[in-house]
Amino acid sequence: MTERLRTVVVGAGAIGAALDAGVSETPLTHAGGYVAAGYDLRALVDVSDNLDAEAAKWGAAAYRDFGTMMQEVRPEIISFAVPASVRASLMLQALEHDCVKAVIAEKPLAASLDEAIALVAAYKAKQVPLIVNYSRRFVPAWQGLVGANAISATIRYAKGIKHNGTHAIDLCRMLFGECLSQRALSGKTDFWNDDPTVTAFLSFERCPEVILQGLDESCFTLFEADIIGPDYRVIVDQDGRRIRRFSLHLEAGIPPGRRLVKESEQDTGAGMAVRNLMQHVLAVCQGERPLCSGEDAIASLQIATRLSEGYQQSQTFKQWSVFFEAHQ
């Protein structure tokens, strides 16, 4: 990097700073990503008890007040890795300072769709690039599948349709184009009280049948995808680290016929996602369009909101049905 831009991470929790034990070639955190990519990590901002230890680990200053940090550090790039409930207000404060060249936000972008729309509009008005960290956008194996036509896809997830579910929705938009329709089938509350995990059926431009299969985060953590095309199949599992590819063979199997046969098993490159993100930020500062923009985040959150509302409406209908049956 020819220019060591000043960077700051707001949020010293797991994805902000804590998951990495220190400097790594394959960082998991925003702090680790900035250091690995050669940026000048100036500060961490948080109100938690672990702030001082995390800041010391990265050789950065510790701030408990965002406004003070902005005045003293004048960061050029900021990562917001705090909960969605407080993220939008801090991101708007950042726009009051002309030092900011780009911002990275964790997902979901905001606590509500209206808040996200207002936030993106504010960044657009100030002409400050906004990158949303839907991490699969920065994984080589997924990037290699962009534009593919598929017959069907199944993605298994848990921990909320707006939180982890939007990872799946954004992935489908990246691979298959815009969503044409969506319908909630069932759901459960497995982690967030205000964000159910919804099982849903969706249709996209290049994949007419997508099943989001909602699991239960209280049982285990899982996110995997199974995509089937006219002459191929791709399975990504093992925390997104493994990709298995199958291709069409004639006269294969018993009895002989047209079958999908495993061709390869490889690492997806997911371990480089954070570092790729940080390298992408520099390109965005130089004029490149973000791989995942605020508009992309809004599109996924819109779909997730419709699915959440659809599920909640179905639950209300069921409750009223039970009530009327009981009083007949």
Predicted regions and their residues:
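N-terminal Rossmann-like dinucleotide-binding module
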Residues: 1-57
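C-terminal helix-rich "cap/oligomerization" subdomain common to oxidoreductases
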Residues: 1-5, 53, 77-82, 280-328
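Predominantly a Rossmann-like dinucleotide-binding segment in NAD(P)-dependent oxidoreductases
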Residues: 10-13, 129-192, 314
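Short acidic-hydrophobic, aromatic-tinged amphipathic segments that line or gate anion-handling sites
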Residues: 61-66
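Rossmann-like NAD(P)-binding element
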Residues: 69-89
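Beta-strand-loop-alpha-helix segment that lines the small-molecule cofactor/substrate pocket
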Residues: 76-77, 88-134
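Contiguous beta-strand/loop segments that form the cofactor/metal-binding neighborhood of enzyme cores
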Residues: 166-248, 267-289, 304-308, 322-328
